[in-house]
UniProtKB/Swiss-Prot annotation:
<protein>
    <recommendedName>
        <fullName>tRNA N6-adenosine threonylcarbamoyltransferase</fullName>
        <ecNumber>2.3.1.234</ecNumber>
    </recommendedName>
</protein>
<dbReference type="GO" id="GO:0000408">
    <property type="term" value="C:EKC/KEOPS complex"/>
</dbReference>
<comment type="subunit">
    <text>Monomer. Component of the KEOPS complex that consists of Kae1, Bud32, Cgi121 and Pcc1; the whole complex dimerizes.</text>
</comment>
<dbReference type="InterPro" id="IPR017860">
    <property type="entry name" value="Peptidase_M22_CS"/>
</dbReference>
<keyword id="KW-0012">Acyltransferase</keyword>
<dbReference type="GO" id="GO:0005737">
    <property type="term" value="C:cytoplasm"/>
</dbReference>
<dbReference type="GO" id="GO:0002949">
    <property type="term" value="P:tRNA threonylcarbamoyladenosine modification"/>
</dbReference>
<keyword id="KW-0408">Iron</keyword>
<feature type="binding site">
    <location>
        <position position="176"/>
    </location>
    <ligand>
        <name>substrate</name>
    </ligand>
</feature>
<dbReference type="GO" id="GO:0005506">
    <property type="term" value="F:iron ion binding"/>
</dbReference>
<feature type="binding site">
    <location>
        <position position="107"/>
    </location>
    <ligand>
        <name>Fe cation</name>
    </ligand>
</feature>
<dbReference type="GO" id="GO:0061711">
    <property type="term" value="F:N(6)-L-threonylcarbamoyladenine synthase activity"/>
</dbReference>
<feature type="binding site">
    <location>
        <position position="257"/>
    </location>
    <ligand>
        <name>substrate</name>
    </ligand>
</feature>
<dbReference type="InterPro" id="IPR043129">
    <property type="entry name" value="ATPase_NBD"/>
</dbReference>
<feature type="binding site">
    <location>
        <position position="159"/>
    </location>
    <ligand>
        <name>substrate</name>
    </ligand>
</feature>
<comment type="similarity">
    <text>Belongs to the KAE1 / TsaD family.</text>
</comment>
<comment type="function">
    <text>Required for the formation of a threonylcarbamoyl group on adenosine at position 37 (t(6)A37) in tRNAs that read codons beginning with adenine. Is a component of the KEOPS complex that is probably involved in the transfer of the threonylcarbamoyl moiety of threonylcarbamoyl-AMP (TC-AMP) to the N6 group of A37. Kae1 likely plays a direct catalytic role in this reaction, but requires other protein(s) of the complex to fulfill this activity.</text>
</comment>
Amino acid sequence: MIALGIEGTAHTLGIGIVTENKVLANVFDTLKTEKGGIHPKEAAEHHAKLLKPLLRKALEEAGVSMEDIDVIAFSQGPGLGPALRVVATAARALAIKYNKPIVGVNHCIAHVEITKMFGVKDPVGLYVSGGNTQVLALEGGRYRVFGETLDIGIGNALDVFARELGLGFPGGPKIEKLALKGEKYIELPYAVKGMDLSFSGLLTEAIRKYKSGKYRVEDLAYSFQETAFAALVEVTERALAHTEKEEVVLVGGVAANNRLREMLRIMAEDRGVKFFVPPYDLCRDNGAMIAYTGLRMYKAGIKFKLEETIVKQKFRTDEVEVVW
């Protein structure tokens, strides 16, 4: 079976075409903004403009036509309302035109589900991106969020800090590069509250220290990463201890960070659990993960009526009963 997936929860429009065990195409285009940050209306306009050419490109790359597609999946949420609506409308139009079944997919669940294409069975997932920071795992037939940010996502925190340092957007890779030259750890607020995280205090203090002019930016970048990532690893380790699962996966755009990968790998080795990071194009927001999750849902008998395809800006992972 072949599934087409459309992702458009934020500033990236992605279209993926997959079978049960192979990615046939995975193309995307990301809205570039001067100062970073995303305006929902601009994201929607970007997606609307690029949907047709990107769909054409995906079909060409996969070597298939719309007639060959068995099911159409789309990112139903969580995300920016205007952007989600563009994607849902396109998915509905294609489903009606080509008489195909349609499935709405939870974006956060898809990030973890795509790892199963690579043999991962039942992991704890650390999902880190601009807008999201969650530790989630399957328990009792639903993806439960064991810990999450109480304020801003880790990717957002890195971007804002980079912007304050005059590094531009996206800031994550630039902070990572700068951190490699750090020589000294500077004390910054470490906020783990129960199983949840907070990055706003860390961000505020790091900016304050930078503006004081008393610290090397390399040391601040290094200390920012070490503090934030240690908190992420701590909460992930607690979730592993609680669930007694034997696999941990790292997904989302910030999964590109080599220091975060290294810290998680060390923790996984210490606990004797398997650690996996998908190829980067399947870590970031992408259509292939939506297609793959949608295909698994469809094969398990999940079918959506058109009126059930309404977008959900605040779509929680535990709203979805996982029967696939």
